[in-house]
UniProtKB/Swiss-Prot annotation:
Identification of the protein by name: Cytochrome P450 71D15
Organism this protein belongs to: Mentha piperita
Record's catalysed reaction(s): (4S)-limonene + reduced [NADPH--hemoprotein reductase] + O2 = (1S,6R)-isopiperitenol + oxidized [NADPH--hemoprotein reductase] + H2O + H(+)
Broadest EC class assigned to this enzyme: oxidoreductase
Topology relative to the membrane: Single-pass type II membrane protein
Annotated binding of heme, by residue: 437
PANTHER family: CYTOCHROME P450 71D8 (PTHR47953:SF16), OS08G0105600 PROTEIN (PTHR47953)
Protein role: Hydroxylates (-)-(4S)-limonene to (-)-trans-isopiperitenol, a precursor of (-)-menthol, responsible for the cooling sensation of peppermint. Fluorinated substrate analogs are hydroxylated with the same regio- and stereochemistry.
Enzyme Commission numbers on file: 1.14.14.99
Pfam families with a match to the protein in the record: p450
GO molecular function, one term: iron ion binding
CDD domains: CYP71-like
Length: 498
């Protein structure tokens, strides 16, 4: 009898809560205007059922095929718009860019990025402009990217030594590439490799997997109950406390240390100095500095390592492309002992391989934006605070823009002059407009330089007798489009004299 009463009370609670949500939705003022078309929606959940069991970029690509390049999807309470064409993306990222320049906030970003005091997820504001300007001038300028060359060479040499010692055995390249990228970024930005390097990489991956804005509580932001019951929230706070401990140690170390690896200021020293400057427009808090550090790890490590791993995976699946890329690298660099950014500029085919990889596997498949004010895109009204998702993954596989879009074919870039610098809006893996990735050149150097070394110094085969056709090329869920499974490869040292 007591069990029956308990179930009855639970059912009454769920029904009452559902009715209250429906009433709130009915009472909510409806935006006015000509809105984008979209599929029929269900009460309460809208179009959430379309995402179940699928990666969001895949599900939303199907919506665009039926309803057009500017499509409306109702994700619970959140009015959302999917952009899947060059023209719509150009309007949102260039013509009405200021109106669409906010980021969509999620529970994950608010908790892990210190209430979005960072650069990636910060609203478009004076704080964002100030922090981005400091980041670009002190860390990510072309001059600085070149000055970090000896760090890249040192860390890549460390990786090559490890691979030579493991010759003939399967190596977890996912782990090795993530460690390499993280070490380069730590030394360039913070002056040294941190002790908790591996743990922080793991925390970054978990944070990004939970920051995509597809948690149930993100879809019903007005629901205090869902916000309270969000099971991921407690996990996020546990992660945040551990991240905070690691970042606090980095901050404390810089408070008592006057110089980094270069014998001068690193970016954290600059932020501390500017924190004391009474002339800056927006005060820099300690949380802002921590959020910036976490930004550097998450944006720098995850996107660069993701792209490098996808390149290696595609090369293993396409042996003819691998042979052509290795032949180019070995012919161009055989007389050089060390090389960096300027040297890889002559590797035209390898650079096309990287481009083709980012076309098929963009580091951020769905670029998140949010409206700061009502605007019009392709003739459709996008209301204030609407969530905008630019489906970079879908545009990269659209036959309107790409011949044989499902084929890995780097030679296509011999025939077209498309680049990813934010000018060709069907190909924006780094974004475009005001919020284009500020670390584009830094990230690209951290992909191309190690990749050239790996192709030059080793021949590669798949582990455990696998064939290219056996490879699992699935993507994991999350904000970044990482390989679902770790990439295991067997290196064999290359002898130039042979």
């Amino acid at each position: 009898m007591e069990l029956l009463q308990l179930w009855s009370a639970l059912i009454i609670l769920v029904v009452t809560y559902t009715i209250s949500l429906l009433i709130n939705q009915w009472r909510k003022p409806k935006p006015q205007g000509k809105f984008p078309p979209g599929p029929p929606k269900l009460p309460l959940i809208g179009h959430l059922h379309l995402l179940w069991g699928k990666l969001p970029q895949h599900a939303l690509a199907s919506v665009a095929k039926e309803y057009g390049p500017v499509a409306h999807v109702q994700l619970g309470e959140v009015f959302s718009v999917v952009l899947s064409s060059r023209e719509a993306t150009k309007e949102a990222m260039k013509l009405v860019d200021p109106a669409c320049a906010n980021r969509f906030e999620s529970i994950g970003t608010r908790i892990m990025w210190y209430d979005n005091e960072d650069i990636i997820f910060s609203p478009y504001s004076e704080h964002w402009r100030q922090m981005r300007k400091i980041c670009v001038s002190e860390l990510l300028s072309s001059r600085n990217v070149r000055s970090f060359g000896f760090i890249r060479q040192d860390e890549v040499s460390r990786l090559l030594r490890h691979l030579r010692s493991s010759a003939g055995a399967a190596v977890d390249m996912t782990e090795r590439i993530e460690t390499l990228t993280c070490s380069i970024i730590c030394r360039a930005a913070f002056g040294s490799v941190i002790r908790d390097n591996a743990e922080l990489v793991g925390l970054v991956k978990d944070a990004l997997s939970m920051a995509s804005g597809f948690e149930l509580a993100d879809m019903f932001p007005s629901s205090k109950l869902l916000n309270l019951l969000c099971w991921n929230k407690s996990k996020l706070w546990r992660m945040r406390r551990r991240v905070d401990t690691i970042l606090e140690a980095i901050v404390d170390e810089h408070k008592f240390k006057k110089s980094g690896e270069f014998g001068g200021e690193d970016i954290i020293d600059v932020l501390f100095r500017m924190q004391k400057d009474t002339q800056i427009k927006v005060p820099i808090t300690t949380n802002s500095i921590k959020a910036f550090i976490f930004d550097t790890f998450s944006a720098g490590t995850e996107t660069s390592s993701t792209t490098t791993l996808w390149v290696l995976a595609e090369l293993m699946r396409n042996p003819a492309v691998m042979a052509k890329a290795q032949a180019e690298v070995r012919a161009a660099l055989k007389e050089k002992t060390n090389w960096d950014v300027d040297d890889v500029q002559e590797l035209k085919y390898m650079k096309s391989v990287v481009k083709e990889t980012m076309r098929m596997h963009p580091p951020i498949p769905l670029i998140p934006r949010s409206c700061r004010e009502e605007c019009v895109v392709n003739g459709y009204t996008i209301p204030n605070k609407a969530r905008i998702m630019i489906n970079v993954w879908s545009m990269g596989r659209n036959p309107l823009y790409w011949e044989k879009p499902d084929t890995f074919w780097p030679e296509r870039f011999d025939q077209v002059s498309k680049d990813f610098m934010g000018n060709d809006f069907e190909f924006v893996p780094f974004g475009a407009g005001r919020r284009i990735c500020p670390g584009l050149n830094f990230g690209l150097a951290n992909v191309e330089v190690p990749l050239a070394q790996l192709l030059y110094h080793f021949d590669w085969k798949l582990a455990e007798g696998m064939k290219p056709s056996d490879m699992d090329m699935s993507e994991a869920e999350g904000l970044t489009g990482i390989l679902k499974n770790n990439l295991l490869l067997v290196p064999t040292p290359y002898d130039p004299s042979s």
